[in-house]
Amino acid sequence: MILASQSPRRIELMREAGFDTRVIPANIDETALPDEGPFDLVERLARAKAAAVAKEHAKEGEPVVAADTIVALDGELLGKPADEADARRMLHALSGKTHQVATGVCIVRDGSAESFVDITDVTFYELTHDEIDAYVATGEPMDKAGAYGIQGQYGRMLVEKIDGDFYNVVGLPIAKVVRALSRT
């Protein structure tokens, strides 16, 4: 099996689920199309990643799993922060609010593809300026969409509740992926 991602969290989830995966990241243009909604974007990107890697690297019968995760607050995409100031801006925006984490997943095997989008609602506690500054100072938010990692030592303390799949917020709804793999 090929995992078309270099995300350490996705690699770990696939290996913990018992899959022996080759890691081959896709190199595609991830720019959103004009008027493309966040959920359409993640599904399109997952499909493009899976197709690109399958075309170049997959052996006969070998599945390719690709995923793309975004954080959206009131329709605004929150990607990985550009710098610490950007991380603070995102965390202030998320403070006390519910946002969505969406992961698009695509599995390609022998030319056929199955894709889906999983959406989880995440609600943050009200965060103080000091809490945000302290969290940003850990460095933990800097490589994560929305400037937080729910699985992180500190990021987990920001989240009041979730409605949906915890592992989707981590970066891969692994139970749904396993079920989809059994169908393809």
PLM feature segments, named:
Residues 1-19:
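N-terminal beta1-alpha1 ligand-phosphate binding loop
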Residues 2, 15, 38-184:
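Anionic-ligand binding patches
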